[in-house]
Amino acid sequence: THGIDNPFIEYRDSLSDQNTDKDKYTLVLANPPFKGSLDAESVSGDLLKVCKTKKTELLFLALFLRILKVGGRCACIVPDGVLFGSSTAHKAIRKEIVENQRLEAVISMPSGVFKPYAGVSTAILIFTKTEHGGTDDVWFYDMTADGFSLDDKRSPIADNDIPDIIERFRHLDKEADRKRTDKSFMVPKKDIVANDYDLSINKYKEVEYVAVEYPPTEEIMANIRELEMQIGTEMDELEKLLGL
C-alpha cells in the first residue's frame, strides 16, 4: 500500500463498464498490468472512443485521462512500445496526451528494472489533464541505473540515477539549456508533432562522437612488416628448440 494507512481497494475490472469513475482523482500513480489484448466487448465504450484498441497498455492511459479531474496529474509506467508504436491506436493516445492535455516528462528506464518478473524496457510518462492542451517543452531523461543490478538478482549497486532525476525534475527551469547529448534535455512540442508524436528518447537524443586520430597508412604498414619479421624470427627460434 506504499505507506497509505487506510487504502480503499476494490476488486474489479478497471477497464470494463464496472468502473464508472470519472473526473474523480487529483493524482494517479500507476504501474498497470500489461497482459496484452482484451476482448473488445468487455472494454468500456468511452475508453474505446479515445483509442480503439484491445491493448491494455493503451486503454489504461485512456482510463487515467477519464478518472482524473481537470488539473489532476498522472505518473504512470508504460512499456516502450507505447512511445513509438505505429498503429492508429498508439498514435491516437499519444496525440491525445500531447495535443489535448499537457505532457510534462518522459523518463526512459532500462530493461531489467522489473526483473526477475519482466525484462521489457519501460518509461514513466508524467502528464496533467487539462482538456485544452498546454504541452510546450517536454522533458526527457535517459535513466541507465536505479541502484540495483539489471539482472535477475537485482543486487544493490552504487550507480543510481533516481536522486538525479528527482533533483532535475524539481528544477526544470534549469534544463532548457542542456544539450541533447546530456542525460536529460527538453524537446519542444513542434519537434514531437513533426515526428508523428513519437516519444522514444532515441528519436531526439544526440550521440556525441569523439574523432579518433590514426597514424598515417605508411606508418601502419611499416609496423605490420616489422611485426611480421619479428614473428618470423621467433618462429625460426622455436623450430630450432623443437629440433624441426
Q: Which stretches of residues belong to each language-model region?
A:
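A conserved structural/catalytic subdomain of Rossmann-like adenosyl-cofactor enzymes
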Residues: 11, 16-244
